[in-house]
Amino acid sequence: MFNSDIQYYMRQQHNIKIGETTAEKIKIAVGAVIPDLDEEPEPYVVNGPNLMTAHPVEAAVTYQEIAHCLDKSIAKLESSILHVLELTPPELYSDIVENGIFLSGGGALLRGLAKRFTEKVNIQFHVAEDPLRAVARGTCIALKKTSNYSFLMR
């Protein structure tokens, strides 16, 4: 989702064609979801063919641009989070409010994501320790203790 947003943005705003790999590199280098960061990454320089001439061109992409181009997708996620919270049983909801929500996966590394979600939802969001491996580690723990999680095995 985010990589295709970046590819589309680069076509529309910089008239440059980039692939999935380059979009991923941009996301890692300058990926952000808020326009004001305390620690600003340097702009990321992208090379690719101009869409009109096919001549090679270079474009410097800033984190503010990426925050702008990801805004609609992040807003959809915010809406989904709010919807899920509306459907959450009260007992679980109080645990969530008390402990917060932990973000995992590569998207959790987008600069400002936890802050933006916290401000939108009014519940503390945290980036999991080692977010790229957090789900796999949690699954491993659950599989070792399946008796504790029998309610999940339906």
Where are these regions (language model features)?
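Conserved phosphate-binding/catalytic loops in two-lobed NTP-binding clefts
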Residues: 115-141, 149, 153-154
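Short, charged, low-complexity patches
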Residues: 3, 7, 74, 129-136
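Residue-level signature of catalytic and energy-coupling elements of molecular machines
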Residues: 6, 81, 103, 139
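Active-site phosphate-binding and catalytic loops of NTP-dependent enzymes
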Residues: 16-20, 86-93, 149-152
